Design a protein with these regions (language model features):
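Membrane-proximal, proline-rich intrinsically disordered regions
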Residues: 3, 20-69
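Short coil/linker segments at helix-helix boundaries
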Residues: 129-131, 154-195
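Sec-dependent bacterial lipoprotein signal peptides
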Residues: 1-20
Length: 235
């Protein structure tokens, strides 16, 4: 009888250990940050995601709405009212077309900020890997500058670096520079916003200095960064 009791107890302990082991698994549809930033290839996958999100329809319209509000675009008889609220200037606080641009931009910034923080700690085994990692980090800085620039153009008054609105509180945008789901920062000044944009572009220029422009390039190159910087300075 004692032998049967011992066997039962041992079998129960074995099943318990197996059960605990099976429960200790990563989610099948997501990765924790502890395992998502281990290799240069991981960084490449994150970087690919930057470009995928840029194609998001809600944020894409951020580049077209100013045209719809101007005389450069006019609705046809059968346009289906796509962008109609923007075209007719009937924008209200709850207009989803506008809300979604803000929302999608900050989703993109959350990913970019994660990478700007995490990429530098990824180990590299060769000069080639270090070059690749610097390129991906440079693209992350370029993306952050791009998002901030789009947002400040759409949601802030025109900036005059020598004017009276440079240091007025809350005329810029919230400058989220790290990933923090609890952060609720106030808007920065316009001066602070444009200083941050130019700072990020300077980082991108340094890190992408060896990535020459090419016809049909589909990622950030040094030429693209310089073109974006010129656009910012012309504002």
């Amino acid at each position: 009888m004692k032998l049967i009791t011992k066997i039962t107890l041992i079998a129960g302990l074995g099943l318990g250990l197996v059960a605990c082991e099976n429960l200790d698994q990563e989610p099948y549809n997501q990765l924790s940050t502890e395992v998502a930033f281990k290799t240069v290839d991981n960084a490449m996958y994150w970087r690919n995601g930057f470009y995928k999100r840029l194609r998001d329809a809600a944020f894409y319209y951020a580049t077209t709405y100013p045209e719809l509000q101007s005389d450069l675009a006019n609705a046809s008889e059968d346009f289906g009212n796509r962008g109609g609220i923007i075209h007719t200037w009937n924008i209200e606080a709850g207009t989803t077309d506008v809300r979604d641009i803000w929302h999608r931009a900050y989703i993109g910034l959350a990913n970019v900020n994660q990478c700007i923080t995490k990429f530098p700690s990824i180990p590299t085994a060769s000069a080639n890997e270090r070059t690749r990692l610097n390129q991906y980090l440079g693209e992350a800085y370029a993306f952050r500058a791009y998002y901030f620039f789009q947002l400040v153009q759409l949601f802030s008054p025109k900036y005059d670096p020598n004017g009276s609105n440079k240091d007025v509180a809350n005329l810029g945008i919230p400058l989220l520079l790290t990933f923090d789901v609890t952060a609720l920062p106030n808007r920065a000044t316009l001066g602070q916003t444009y200083t941050q944009i130019l700072s990020d572009l300077a980082q991108a220029e340094t890190l992408l200095s060896n990535k020459a422009g090419a016809v049909g390039a589909d990622t950030f190159t040094i030429d693209a960064v310089k073109a974006l910087k010129a656009r910012v300075l012309l504002t």
